């Protein structure tokens, strides 16, 4: 019987406070997270940003218990999905591959090879595709595949995007419905979709489909809610988690919260539409920061819809995705990782950065430059790093 490996891909997150700095470094080292024209400076810049942001990020993780629950929840999702698939007669084993923290994709690939898996289905835990999330994970997996003759022999099928999956839409709608019915005035409760933002240039210059898929997804959920409730609530879509001075997708979540409060909205049902697990953006950014902004602007009842986690209907929806992928037309790893023609990324391998002879001189020069910049800003209290929000 064919042994199928289900590779669940996600972002990853620091499980302890001391992991925050290295996690941020891995995140900002990815040219699909921060795109710069000179690839040599990618890793030095990642070191600088992660160093300057570590303290603030550590405080955020401390406020939710000292670390991210993302690995624990993703591994629970993997176990539940494996169980559901086996009940359906699929000889499946689930694996977790995190992009920026443990267990890394490379570790999952090693386990897949050791277990004698015959076929792999790749399922990113991002309902909506973006070059910076699913795309980055697909391309990391392709890089590992190209470098590994044994792994290259394994048939791989990919699920590129699933924002319109029936189980996902139904699960989201049901959890939103439950919160709406707890409001004092359910028919007038305002549904507030908040998605993780991406730079506007990703969509307008690079052709990222993320914005379209987020918007289509929110409409599908609203349609499902109307069938269940018999009425349409007012709703708004916004984007959160912006970093740096570059313009990101708008409207920004904090701005819309202020506008809704000032326009008289009293009951808000907040929906983290692009997140399928509880993590820092839901537990700290939404539950603490955005809730405080809402209260300051007169929104009395701030209700946040919980993340899907291992919600049974959601797990069944994921299982449907896998079985359809196995039975339907093949989407290869090359197809899934393909970028729009306009995207320009810079392979880090072409640029040395580390403690070796070829890099040591440049390491010293860059480090000295960074040190001088930081020292000047600390002395004068102003400059580009303050403008970027890093100091």
Curated annotation (Swiss-Prot):
Listed Gene3D superfamilies: 3.40.50.1400
Compartment(s) where it occurs, according to its Swiss-Prot or TrEMBL record: Cytoplasm
One of the GO biological process terms: heme biosynthetic process
Record's protein name: Ferrochelatase
One example GO MF annotation: ferrochelatase activity
Disulfide bonds: none
Name of the encoding gene: hemH
Domain of life: Bacteria
Catalytic reaction equation(s): heme b + 2 H(+) = protoporphyrin IX + Fe(2+)
Record InterPro entries: Ferrochelatase, Ferrochelatase_AS, Ferrochelatase_C, Ferrochelatase_N
